[in-house]
Amino acid sequence: MAQPRGAGLGGLARPSGGIGPILVVEDDSDTRHALGEMLTDLFPGSRVLMAESGEAALELIRRTRPRVVILDLHLGGIHGFDFAAHVAAMADGPPPAIVALTGDASPDTVRRAEAAGFAAFLRKPADADTLETVLRPILEA
């Protein structure tokens, strides 16, 4: 179930000539690549970046300043909520909007995501229609 939210962690100003990079952070290779393909089809003007760990994603965020990060909450190494706190603490400009992606859509997890400032919540498996419904308003804001 997708639950878009308004404010979240904020977002970067819309860049001229496009909607900015989208970063997928997912440790499962099949899921990561499927999301990448769907996003490329849905947002052909955007660069879709992929990371298999939170640590790799933090480095990509520093270098590429994505507009949106789609984040698996249950990564190995760093939990999604800790990752979001690291991103929010980065001092080099406004943080990207972070969209939670998880198979755990329990009320407690949804509340924690809202409290952590996630821009939206996606339940796995996310289909193309749901991705577009949740991401387009964030990307076009």
Predicted regions and their residues:
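Active-site beta3 strand of CheY-like receiver
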Residues: 64-70, 75
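C-terminal output helix
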Residues: 126-135
